[in-house]
From Swiss-Prot:
The keyword Cytoplasm applies. It comes from Corynebacterium glutamicum (strain R). GO terms for biological process: gluconeogenesis; glucose 6-phosphate metabolic process; glycolytic process. Belongs to the GPI family. CDD domains: SIS_PGI_1 (cd05015), SIS_PGI_2 (cd05016). Keywords: Cytoplasm, Gluconeogenesis, Glycolysis, Isomerase. It is found in: Cytoplasm. This is Glucose-6-phosphate isomerase. InterPro entries: G6P_Isomerase, G6P_Isomerase_C, Phosphoglucose_isomerase_CS, SIS_dom_sf, SIS_PGI_1, SIS_PGI_2. The active site is at 351 (proton donor), 382, 506. PROSITE patterns: P_GLUCOSE_ISOMERASE_1, P_GLUCOSE_ISOMERASE_2, P_GLUCOSE_ISOMERASE_3. Pathway: Carbohydrate biosynthesis; gluconeogenesis; Carbohydrate degradation; glycolysis; D-glyceraldehyde 3-phosphate and glycerone phosphate from D-glucose: step 2/4.
């Protein structure tokens, strides 16, 4: 496709921005039905886009980008299993991980739905055995603790989801997650473990990932010291496709759960990578989790673009980053259970769309890839909201909240959850409408303080509400952002499904390891790195 910035649709949007940029949300909200017009439903989510900087003309011109970029055709191609990942010649089929068993999808001659449900069936049997006490450790003890060892998509997804759905952990099994090659990560987990009731899940597609295998070998040594070599087979399982390496490690390949090249790591929480999650919340709720994904997939696939929530949110991201110059995007869940959601989205969005060349290798001419970050409310209000409210940088933000908490406590005449949500609604209101100098002066504020207290408003937010944080709703939330990523990648004409920027650092680390450990002389090829390694060796 042509560079999107050279199209008439992009030029029309550029001209529109010149005329629209001074428009305020106060002005836009003079339209009586604005909130109703820009509120949508998708897979159990209630999504209010009305506090964004757009009007009908903006939306029409943003939607024109989808025509220019061939978005409809690319969506259909993704769901059909065409090789959208052109640099690795792979299908992009994370949506197949949540297809119903009766679905009909074959790719490259393989019945994908049948393959997915065969693995799900094995996962279900294994999780059921753990939860019922039929799977026992080497000494006959039931498993009470699972330690998931992985990194990137093999850690961030299941760790986030397990915390988010902790209210559904009803079988007495809990999970810890180890990812960092910093030994403090594993050591801090092992300190509190009972080897006899612990199961390690080693998640690595190739079973060669440096950080994961380093942690797995250290965990294996710890277990062997406690229980002996023969215990390994009853206390380790693998999420991998490399049967040879798994067997060499001492894991019975009958306890190896695979996934496929068409699943990227950051899109894999609903694959076998979610084994730890399934063991903690149970197969029934895991299937509800998948159902939420599928509901959002169907909304994305079938809903007309002007009412399609992932598409609209993706277009707003392009609007802010490429026209308003916003560089970051805050995700602010007013839910402690979603405290790891922003970290999860960082990999999903930034590893996907942090690209500087088009699919054909030519340089991009627009901005790409928003920087995602965030913390749960109300903590963020007492940390970084000051900058969002009164700073010089535009930070579009997504607020995520729920009508009903899993637990609640009294707070005077109200409840703590009502207090939480009062803050939630207040923040989006103040960010949108602020308070001007005239209004502040009318309150009797000293003249020299008026400008300090002005709240400019006009800070765009999207509000996402659901009745309750359930497995289904979490699945829908994740799929929402997955599809936002895909749409933006299509608009920018980049490959959202590779990650070559991760590889060179891995290679360099392997090359430097002998010098860092003292096995070889220091000669990295640049004086800075050489001097830093020499300092490290002299002071360790």
């Amino acid at each position: 496709m042509a560079d999107i910035s050279t199209t008439q649709a992009w030029q029309d949007l550029t001209d529109h921005y010149s005329n629209f940029q001074a428009t305020t949300l106060r002005e836009l909200f003079k339209e009586e039905n604005r909130a109703e017009k820009y509120t949508f439903s998708a897979a159990g989510l209630h999504v209010d886009l009305s506090k964004n900087l757009l009007d009908d003309a903006t939306l029409t011109k943003l939607l024109a980008l989808t025509e220019e970029s061939g978005l409809r055709e690319r969506i259909d191609a993704m769901f059909a299993g065409e090789h959208l990942n052109n640099t690795e010649d792979r299908a992009v089929l994370h949506t197949a991980l949540r297809l119903p068993a009766e679905a009909d999808l074959s790719v490259d001659g393989q019945d994908v739905a049948a393959d997915v449900h065969e693995v799900l069936g094995r996962m279900r049997d294994f999780a059921t055995a753990l939860r019922s006490g039929n799977w026992l450790g080497y000494t006959g003890h039931t498993i009470k603790k699972i330690v998931n060892i992985g990194i990137g998509g093999s850690d961030l997804g299941p760790a986030m989801a397990t915390k988010a759905l902790r209210a559904y952990a009803t079988a007495g099994i809990s999970a810890e997650f180890v990812s960092n090659v910093d030994p403090a990560d594993l050591v801090s987990v092992l300190e509190d473990l009972d080897a006899e009731s612990t199961l390690f899940v080693v998640a690595s597609k190739t079973f060669t990932t440096q950080e994961t295998l380093s942690n797995a070998r250290a965990a294996r040594a710890w277990l062997v010291e406690k229980l002996g070599e023969e215990a390994v087979a009853k206390h380790f399982v693998a999420v991998s496709t490399n049967a040879e390496k798994v067997a060499e490690f001492g894991i019975d390949t009958d306890n190896m759960f695979g996934f496929w090249d068409w699943v990227g790591g950051r899109y894999s929480v609903d694959s076998a990578v979610g084994l730890s999650l399934m063991a903690v919340i149970g197969p029934r709720d895991f299937m509800r989790f998948l159902g939420g994904f599928h509901a959002m997939d169907e909304h994305f696939r079938t809903t007309k673009f002007e009412e399609n929530v992932p598409i609209l949110m993706a277009l707003l991201g392009v609007w802010y980053s490429d026209f308003y110059g916003a560089e970051t995007h805050a995700v602010l869940p007013y839910s402690e259970d979603l405290s790891r959601f922003a970290a999860y989205l960082q990999q999903l969005t930034m590893e996907s769309n942090g690209k500087s060349v088009h699919r054909d290798g030519s340089p991009v001419s627009t901005g790409t890839g928003e920087i995602y970050w965030g913390e749960p409310g109300t903590n963020g209000q007492h940390a970084f909201f000051q900058l969002i409210h009164q700073g010089t940088r535009l930070v579009p933000a997504d607020f995520i909240g729920f009508a009903r908490p899993k637990q609640d406590l009294p707070a005077g005449e109200r409840t703590m959850h009502d207090l939480l949500m009062s803050n939630f609604f207040a923040q989006t209101k103040v960010l949108a409408f602020g308070k001007n100098a005239e209004e502040i002066a009318a309150e009797g504020v000293a003249p020299e303080l008026v400008n300090h207290k002005v709240m400019p408003g006009n800070r765009p937010t999207t509000t996402i509400l659901a009745e309750e944080l359930t497995p289904s709703i979490l699945g829908a939330l994740i799929a929402l952002y997955e599809h936002i990523v895909m749409v933006q990648g299509v608009i920018w004409d980049i490959n959202s499904f590779d990650q070559w920027g991760v590889e060179l650092g891995k290679q360099q680390a392997n090359d430097l390891a002998p010098a860092v450990s003292g096995e070889e002389d220091v000669d990295s090829g640049d004086s800075s790195t050489d001097s830093l390694i020499k300092w490290y060796r002299a002071n360790r």
